[in-house]
Amino acid sequence: MKSLLFTLAVFMLLAQLVSGNWYVKKCLNDVGICKKKCKPEEMHVKNGWAMCGKQRDCCVPADRRANYPAFCVQTKTTRTSTVTATTATTTLMMTTASMSLMAPTPVSPTG
C-alpha cells in the first residue's frame, strides 16, 4: 500500500514538471494556430493579437488560406546577415494650407 501511495505521489509531481503543452490554442474559427512565430509558408492573420494575445501570432496554413483571404496578410521580409526586417509602406499627405503655415516668418534683427 505504501508503494502505491509513493507511486501516485511521484506521478503527481512529474505531472507538474512536464514542460509540454497538451492544449494547442486555435484561432480564426479553428483554422489557425497561435504561435510565437509563423513558418515561412504560413500566413499570419491581421489583428491576430485579439485572438492569441500580444505575444503570439495567429498562423494559418497555406492550404486553408483560401477560406479566409480577407484576414490573411503576407508581409515582405528582407533577410540580411543576421536580422530579418519587415518593410511597410506609408504615404504622407500634406495640403498647401499646412505648407504655408510652416513657412518661415521674417524676423527683424533689432527685435
UniProtKB/Swiss-Prot annotation:
Main location: secreted
UniProt entry keywords in alphabetical sequence: Antibiotic, Antimicrobial, Cleavage on pair of basic residues, Defensin, Disulfide bond, Fertilization, Secreted, Signal
Secreted as UniProt keyword: yes
Disulphide bond pairs: 27-58, 34-52, 38-59
Keyword Iron: no
Membrane-spanning residues: none
Region (In vitro binds to LPS, mediates antimicrobial activity and inhibits LPS-mediated inflammation): 21-63
GO BP annotation list: defense response to Gram-negative bacterium; single fertilization
Subcellular location field: Secreted
InterPro entries (alphabetical): Beta-defensin (IPR050544)
Signal peptide span: 1-20
GO cellular component terms listed in the entry, alphabetical order: extracellular region
Post-translational modification: O-glycosylated; glycans contain alpha(2,3)-linked sialic acids.
Function: Highly glycosylated atypical beta-defensin involved in several aspects of sperm function. Facilitates sperm transport in the female reproductive tract and contributes to sperm protection against immunodetection; both functions are probably implicating the negative surface charge provided by its O-linked oligosaccharides in the sperm glycocalyx. Involved in binding of sperm to oviductal epithelial cells to form a sperm reservoir until ovulation.
Assembly, per entry: Homodimer or homooligomer; disulfide-linked.
Similarity comment text for this entry: Belongs to the beta-defensin family.
Protein name: Beta-defensin 126
